[in-house]
């Protein structure tokens, strides 16, 4: 079972709002809204599903919007201001950061396809609105872009559970990079687009 699906099934029903990325964005103070709410001014906005159990940035994209969002977004999607900067994925245990990794992208690749992830010492604190939820789960994971919170997960980052310092994703429709000194771990039966990861 995909790790996010297991987290959804196992969580306290009162905490299901954590899976709602629009609620997280709104609570974080971001400029955002669901399909049907017009954008405040013309420009590029980030669009993605409100809930995405599959992960991997499925259907996430930048869209230029003049005003109305009805024609450009599908039901179940939301828009948000665009953030720039470092993409950090941080695991917390009882509010303390226990795993901190930074993603590297290539500008010519799709938004959701990272070139690699590496451990780092950089991190951000958990948002205050999360309250006592971290006390009820073994690990909480948060993702930030440029210091702005974009997602919360009621589980840890599975890609760094192998004693590794770095991860290189392998995508099914792209050439296998076969990096020297890394070992391959298959994603078979887990992710649709990703074939697996190289770890070191």
Question: Model features per residue range: what roles?
Answer:
Residues 2-129:
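Active-site nucleotide/adenylate-binding loops and adjacent lid/helix of ATP-dependent enzymes
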Residues 56, 108-200:
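ATP-dependent carboxylate activation and anion-phosphoryl transfer catalytic cores
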């Amino acid at each position: 079972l995909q790790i996010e699906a297991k987290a959804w099934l196992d969580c306290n029903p009162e905490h299901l709002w954590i899976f709602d990325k629009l609620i997280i964005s709104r609570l974080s103070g971001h400029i955002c809204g669901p399909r049907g709410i017009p954008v405040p001014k013309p420009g590029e906005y980030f669009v993605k599903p409100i809930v995405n159990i599959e992960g991997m940035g499925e259907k996430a994209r930048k869209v230029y919007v003049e005003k109305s969002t009805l024609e450009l977004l599908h039901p179940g999607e939301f828009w948000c201001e665009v953030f720039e900067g470092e993409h950090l994925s941080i695991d917390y245990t009882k509010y303390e950061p226990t795993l901190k990794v930074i993603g590297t992208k290539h500008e010519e690749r799709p938004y959701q396809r990272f070139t690699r992830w590496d451990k780092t010492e950089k991190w951000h604190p958990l948002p205050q609105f999360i309250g006592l939820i971290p006390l009820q789960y073994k690990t909480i994971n948060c993702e930030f872009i440029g210091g702005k919170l974009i997602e919360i997960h009621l589980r840890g980052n599975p890609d760094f559970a192998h004693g590794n310092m770095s991860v290189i994703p392998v995508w099914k429709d792209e050439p296998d990079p076969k990096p020297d000194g890394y070992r391959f771990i298959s994603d078979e039966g887990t992710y649709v687009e990703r074939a697996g990861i190289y770890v070191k």
